[in-house]
Regions:
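C-terminal structural segments of small proteins and small subunits
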Residues: 53-88
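Absolute protein N-terminus
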Residues: 1-3
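Compact, glycine-rich, soluble single-domain proteins
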Residues: 6-47, 51-57, 64, 79
Length: 88
């Protein structure tokens, strides 16, 4: 399963949101990959998520494969939609 997800928090994927992405991804057995600007990373690796350096308004491709892929996608979509708690 693959979807595009937009970064809507003003500061982009800095340390705190990256940690939240990794924590969310780690709750699932499925393989979760995020792609941005010709980089594809493992969403369960904090260093990899930080290296994406995805800014505000970036469109990320999220690909999830596994038995709990629907639940994982729903959780990640909700996390990104919340702006990681940084929206004013």
């Amino acid at each position: 399963m693959e979807k595009m997800i937009k970064v809507i928090n003003p500061l982009g994927l800095h340390a705190r949101p990256a940690a939240k992405v990794v924590d969310c991804a780690a709750r699932f057995n499925s393989a979760i990959r995020i792609s941005y600007q010709n980089q594809e990373i493992d969403a369960k690796s904090i260093m990899s998520v930080l290296m994406l350096a995805a800014p505000f308004d970036a469109e990320l491709s999220v690909a999830i494969t596994g038995d709990d892929e629907n639940d994982a996608m729903t959780a990640l979509e909700a996390l990104f939609a919340s702006g990681f708690g940084e929206l004013e």
